């Protein structure tokens, strides 16, 4: 399986080398766990389909619990020879199903990072565009679709959080991770009362030093290219910016 995955990524890098600037992956690096949901056919990792009709509306109306039960089973299967170890999993797609996570993993801790929507919406649109090579594509029509999709995802997560104990979640600013990654990690460990040894902290620091932002190239994108204005995004995400005091500089 490793050999097959390595060959897959090598071919993908050849076909779309610019994608490394956006979301670098290889057979030897971490990847988002949400790919485990691909087999349920109810997964945001299909790409733009979750933003397009009719699949988009169908997806947003579904009960995600059956898919997450499958997701949990896959994790158990992967861990069956190493019981008791703690998973560290990551995907923004989980914002659609925080209730599923807390139900199926009753001792889970949730870390949510917050980022300037002016950057996030455009960055996401650019990433999705990179997956549409060879297809007819209108950026100016796509931008508003991406904005609405992300706004609805955030709204969905806020509704679910009303039923989740605050001590199970920590909210962090994306800018803090970039400015002081290890210091932000300390805050996470303190919030969830987890032991942070000197060895673990050194390993975090070493990783941060070896993987600075932009290591694989700068991801360039411009708001206007996607048919959006600053005012539109600020208006749509005003509830989010105010709620989490998101830095806009």
Predicted regions and their residues:
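Short, hydrophobic/aromatic alpha-helical segments in well-folded domains
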Residues: 74, 97-100
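Short, solvent-exposed loop/turn segments at secondary-structure junctions
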Residues: 42, 93-96, 116-119, 127, ...
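PAPS-dependent sulfotransferases, especially Golgi type II membrane carbohydrate sulfotransferases
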Residues: 51-68, 75, 79-82, 121-171, ...
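Short, well-ordered loop/turn elements at secondary-structure boundaries
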Residues: 81-85, 104-108, 166
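Conserved phosphate-donor/acceptor-positioning beta-strand/loop module used by diverse small-molecule
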Residues: 90, 101-126
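Long, contiguous hydrophobic alpha-helical segments, chiefly transmembrane helices and signal peptides
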Residues: 75, 87-88, 112-114, 233
């Amino acid at each position: 399986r490793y050999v097959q995955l390595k060959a897959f990524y090598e071919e993908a890098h050849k076909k779309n080398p610019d994608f490394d600037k956006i979301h670098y992956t290889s057979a030897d690096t971490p990847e988002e766990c949400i790919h485990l949901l691909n087999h349920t056919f109810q997964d945001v990792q299909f790409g733009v389909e979750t933003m397009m009709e009719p699949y988009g509306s169908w997806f947003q109306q579904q009960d995600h619990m059956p898919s997450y039960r499958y997701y949990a089973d896959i994790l158990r299967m992967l861990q069956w020879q190493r019981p008791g170890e703690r998973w560290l999993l990551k995907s923004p797609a989980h914002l659609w199903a925080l209730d599923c996570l807390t139900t199926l993993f009753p001792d889970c801790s949730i870390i949510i990072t917050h980022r300037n929507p002016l950057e996030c919406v455009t960055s996401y649109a650019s990433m999705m565009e990179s997956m549409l090579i060879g297809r007819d594509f209108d950026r100016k029509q796509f931008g508003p679709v991406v904005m609405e999709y992300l706004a609805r995802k955030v709204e969905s997560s806020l509704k679910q959080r009303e039923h989740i104990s605050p001590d199970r979640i920590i909210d962090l600013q994306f800018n803090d991770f970039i400015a002081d990654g290890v210091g932000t990690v300390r805050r996470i460990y303190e919030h969830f009362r987890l032991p942070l040894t000197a060895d673990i902290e050194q390993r975090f620091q070493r990783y941060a030093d070896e993987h600075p932002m932009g290591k694989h190239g700068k991801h360039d994108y411009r708001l206007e290219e996607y048919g959006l204005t600053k005012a539109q995004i600020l208006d749509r995400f005003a509830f989010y910016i105010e709620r989490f005091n998101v830095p806009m500089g």
